[in-house]
């Protein structure tokens, strides 16, 4: 009897220890504000969830862009754009940037350095072809929303809002942030398109809580979120983050933090994730450079869905990308994520991504080595690997398998649909497929375009990571 009681007590303590993680650092789990936010987020998850994910896979492969077409939007949106002309002029002066335009991930001097432009601008994949290599990109920033593909295709961020210019890197007031700071921008109620007046390195004192309908657009400036807390999107929707460098993120102690204009509360300790997506929907992360965070680079958990992670460059990290964190969280069955045109580069160990429950389309990414494995999962996720290049670690013959399945015997995981098509394998890398060998996308093929062969990924991912755009020049 005493043994049974002791066992129950241990179980209670273990469950209690999980609550801060499950609650995403909300110190007061009875806070009515967060309870309501969670309920609202579940509604957005149901709205964002696509009952036929294969249709979105087709959408990713199909969509054509006519770069000659003006896609500025409705008359109302054009009027808003006209009113913003003075703001754009302020941040569009060539004197605000003395840096050269970028060529891409180069092999020049210095590891991980950008090489100098030696020819005309080139855009190497469909997302970039939608907006890059156009000299007026800075005056037409919001055209970016027409370029997203994959499960995050409905994301518009701050398209319908005004432009907010961040002028200061300071982050010294968590409850009443100063106007002109990034923290002040992201807590506003209305949609905003957030840009930066000049280069800056922002050391966040506590996690940065972003509200819905925001775009953080770092094009034209060299913006680093580093050596402090990370970025959190909790129970929010419709957010674009583009062009940031996120690195050396560390744990933060928590405390009173404002997460919107009308609410602040006590947050617990943050783990040190670079970007945390918690119960959030319609999220697009594009051209992000990430490395060396204390926990994960990107975590998307607790029913987050309708996410595209594209054109990003990941280096020097252990747990790269976690999609679903709880084995018993059924909300993650609705998780749908596209991982496309990314470069998983030097010094990475595992989780590129690691998936629970959800549906993930991994397409045309470049995997240049890993220490343990590249793609992993548990709880029966569906993983479609299309047109990726996998280069196994040259001196670790026991770690040449791309895939890793956890918490299941072969008799169970053999039924999970993990399929590989048009992938390229080097250094004896191999992808262990499972599920139906005749598994095909059974859906409308009105505009079906198949993924590029994995041999093309070096070109498709050439400009992965934050771009060094110069205002007035093709980016």
UniProtKB/Swiss-Prot annotation:
GO MF annotations, alphabetized: metal ion binding; pectate lyase activity
EC numbers on record: 4.2.2.2
Pathway participation: Glycan metabolism; pectin degradation; 2-dehydro-3-deoxy-D-gluconate from pectin: step 2/5
Broad EC category: lyase
Reaction(s) catalysed (UniProt annotation): Eliminative cleavage of (1->4)-alpha-D-galacturonan to give oligosaccharides with 4-deoxy-alpha-D-galact-4-enuronosyl groups at their non-reducing ends
Region (Disordered): 91-117
Residues that carry a glycan: 67, 96
Cofactor note: Binds 1 Ca(2+) ion. Required for its activity.
Amino-acid positions noted as binding Ca(2+) in the UniProt annotation, renumbered to this chain: 271, 295, 299
GO biological process: pectin catabolic process
Cofactor(s) it depends on: Ca(2+)
Protein's name according to its UniProt entry: Probable pectate lyase 7
Lineage: Eukaryota, Viridiplantae, Streptophyta, Embryophyta, Tracheophyta
């Amino acid at each position: 009897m005493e043994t049974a009681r002791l066992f129950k007590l241990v179980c209670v303590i273990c469950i209690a220890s999980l609550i801060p993680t499950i609650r995403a650092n909300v110190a007061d789990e009875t806070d009515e504000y967060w309870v309501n936010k969670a309920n609202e987020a579940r509604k957005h998850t149901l709205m964002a969830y696509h009952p036929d994910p294969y249709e979105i896979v087709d959408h990713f492969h199909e969509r054509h862009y006519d770069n000659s077409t003006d896609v500025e939007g409705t008359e109302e949106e054009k009027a808003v754009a006209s009113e913003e002309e003075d703001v754009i002029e302020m941040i569009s002066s060539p004197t605000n940037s003395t840096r050269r335009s970028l060529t891409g991930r180069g092999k020049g001097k210095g590891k991980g350095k950008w090489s100098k432009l030696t020819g005309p601008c080139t855009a190497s994949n469909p997302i970039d072809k939608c907006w890059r290599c156009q000299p007026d990109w800075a005056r037409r920033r919001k055209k970016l929303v027409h370029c997203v593909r994959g499960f995050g295709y409905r994301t518009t961020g701050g398209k319908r809002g005004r432009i907010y210019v961040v002028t200061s890197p300071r982050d010294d007031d968590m409850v009443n942030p100063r106007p002109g700071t990034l923290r002040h921008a992201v807590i506003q109620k209305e949609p905003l398109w957030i840009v930066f007046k000049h280069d800056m390195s922002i050391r966040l004192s506590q996690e940065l809580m972003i509200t819905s309908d925001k775009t953080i657009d770092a094009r034209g400036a060299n913006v680093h979120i580093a050596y402090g807390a990370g970025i959190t999107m909790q129970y929010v929707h419709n957010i674009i983050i583009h062009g940031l460098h996120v690195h050396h993120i560390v744990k933060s102690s928590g405390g009173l933090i404002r997460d919107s204009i009308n609410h602040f509360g006590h947050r617990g300790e943050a783990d040190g994730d670079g970007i945390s997506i918690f119960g959030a929907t319609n999220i697009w992360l594009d051209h992000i450079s990430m490395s060396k965070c204390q926990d994960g680079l990107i975590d998307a958990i607790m029913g987050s869905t309708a996410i595209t992670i594209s054109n990003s460059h990941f280096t020097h990290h252990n747990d790269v990308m976690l999609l679903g964190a709880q084995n018993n969280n059924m909300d993650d069955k609705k998780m749908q994520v596209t991982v496309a045109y990314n470069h998983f580069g030097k010094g990475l160990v595992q989780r590129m991504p690691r998936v629970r429950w959800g549906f993930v389309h991994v397409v045309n990414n470049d995997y240049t080595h890993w220490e343990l494995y590249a793609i992993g999962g548990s709880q029966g996720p569906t993983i479609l690997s299309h047109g990726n290049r996998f280069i196994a670690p040259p001196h670790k013959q026991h770690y040449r398998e791309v895939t890793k399945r956890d918490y299941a015997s072969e008799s169970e995981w053999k039924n999970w649909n993990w399929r590989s098509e048009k992938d390229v394998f080097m250094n004896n890398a191999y992808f262990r497929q499972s599920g139906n060998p005749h598994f095909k996308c059974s859906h409308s093929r009105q505009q079906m375009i198949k993924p590029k062969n994995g041999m093309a990924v070096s070109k498709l991912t050439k400009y992965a990571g934050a771009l060094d755009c110069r205002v007035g020049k093709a980016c």
